[in-house]
């Protein structure tokens, strides 16, 4: 599925009804038209850019000062950077849709900029998985966390996730190119699988669906099921705001990426002559724009989570975000849980 144009498979211009181009009138004058989905995508892109750049830049600014000493700040700093990179590419994608998919920015920009949305998808879900593992260890392995949970280890984990995300984005870099539209003067930027094996498009679609959606969904569901059971069974951990924030972020990720993943699989598996394919293809820009909403919702979640009953209007946005993303009660509870565990084991050894 292509973040730029509605053509996400092999480039071909043969139409079943024998006409050179179904959108071209009989007099040969091609008048490009904008689909309703494209108009909706433009509105969403504009809103996401305004909110996403401002919000994520604020999160980066707040967490950058905390990242030297707190693990939570490192997690959310990297999430904000991934979202901010995607949001900064939006003006170019916006321009491409306004120009009816014409790409005036050159070959290198075609390779890099649209691929940022995939880099954001993979880096976000891998970072969310890492954050979830951190939450899991804090609850179930508090002694280990007291010894080894340090900012240095968190930075190493983030580095690994970024490398993996880049590796998973390689197919977009390899198969994306620009070409001239034979029916107009437009230059198009899209995915071309014609030079790869016949199965490459389906293989990439399956990889993207499994690694970027299904497997993380199953893993995070299992992880948070155990976390919620343990969290609500202990009074000391019932007010863990970071756990709730992470769960909200994870939920938004899967909700906004679901249309993109579903339509991507449909476009990869159905023949281009299928009426279903053509209908889904018209929704391409809209589904990509919905995925982009995920890039701006995290700062909103942080602010909403930090709106306490007292002093809502007196507190500034940076202080709200700093409070939400700080090392919360869960970290303190792990310390108390560690002490209680050690005390219990000491009592058992004395009894023996």
From Swiss-Prot:
Record topological domains on the Cytoplasmic side: 66-70, 134-154, 229-244, 306-352
Entry keywords, A to Z: Cell membrane, Chemotaxis, Cytoplasmic vesicle, Disulfide bond, G-protein coupled receptor, Glycoprotein, Membrane, Phosphoprotein, Receptor, Sulfation, Transducer, Transmembrane, Transmembrane helix
InterPro entries: Anphylx_rcpt_C3a/C5a1-2 (IPR002234), Formyl_rcpt-rel (IPR000826), GPCR_Rhodpsn (IPR000276), GPCR_Rhodpsn_7TM (IPR017452)
GO terms for cellular component: apical part of cell; basolateral plasma membrane; cell surface; cytoplasmic vesicle; plasma membrane
Region named Disordered: 1-20, 332-352
Locations listed in the record: Cell membrane; Cytoplasmic vesicle
Membrane topology: Multi-pass membrane protein
Predominant place of localization: membrane
Topological domains annotated Extracellular: 1-38, 95-111, 176-202, 268-284
Modified residues annotated as Sulfotyrosine in this record: 13, 15
Family the entry assigns: Belongs to the G-protein coupled receptor 1 family.
Name of the protein: C5a anaphylatoxin chemotactic receptor 1
Naturally occurring in which organism (per UniProt): Rattus norvegicus (Rat)
Lineage of the species this protein comes from: Eukaryota, Metazoa, Chordata, Craniata, Vertebrata
């Amino acid at each position: 599925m292509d973040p730029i144009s509605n053509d996400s498979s092999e480039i071909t211009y043969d139409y079943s009804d024998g006409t050179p181009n179904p959108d071209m009138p009989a007099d040969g004058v091609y008048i490009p038209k904008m689909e309703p989905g494209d108009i909706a995508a433009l509105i969403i892109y504009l809103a996401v850019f305004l909110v996403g750049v401002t919000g994520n830049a604020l999160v980066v600014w707040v967490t950058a000062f905390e990242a030297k000493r707190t693990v939570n700040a490192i997690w959310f700093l990297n999430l904000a950077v991934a979202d901010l990179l995607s949001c900064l590419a939006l003006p170019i994608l916006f321009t491409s849709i306004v120009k009816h998919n014409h790409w005036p920015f050159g070959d290198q920009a075609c390779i890099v900029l649209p691929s940022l949305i995939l880099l954001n998808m993979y880096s976000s879900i891998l970072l969310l998985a890492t954050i979830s593992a951190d939450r899991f260890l804090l609850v179930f392995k508090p002694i280990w966390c007291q010894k080894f949970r340090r900012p240095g280890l968190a930075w190493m984990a983030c580095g690994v996730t970024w490398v993996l995300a880049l590796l998973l984005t390689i197919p977009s870099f390899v198969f994306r190119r620009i070409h001239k539209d034979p029916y107009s003067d437009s230059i198009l930027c899209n995915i071309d699988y014609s030079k790869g094996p016949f199965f490459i498009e389906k293989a990439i679609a399956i990889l993207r669906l499994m690694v970027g959606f299904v497997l993380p969904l199953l893993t995070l569901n299992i992880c948070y099921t155990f976390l919620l059971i343990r969290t609500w069974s202990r009074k000391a951990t019932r007010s863990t705001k970071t756990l709730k924030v992470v769960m909200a972020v994870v939920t938004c990720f899967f909700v906004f990426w679901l249309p993109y993943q579903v339509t991507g699989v449909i476009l990869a598996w159905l023949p281009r002559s299928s009426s279903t394919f053509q209908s889904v293809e018209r929704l391409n820009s809209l589904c990509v724009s919905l995925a982009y909403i995920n890039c701006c919702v995290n700062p909103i979640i942080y602010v909403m989570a930090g709106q306490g009953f007292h002093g809502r209007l007196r507190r500034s946005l940076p202080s709200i975000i700093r409070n939400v993303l700080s090392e919360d009660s869960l970290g303190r509870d792990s310390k108390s849980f560690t002490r209680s565990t050690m005390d219990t084991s000491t009592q058992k050894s004395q009894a023996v």
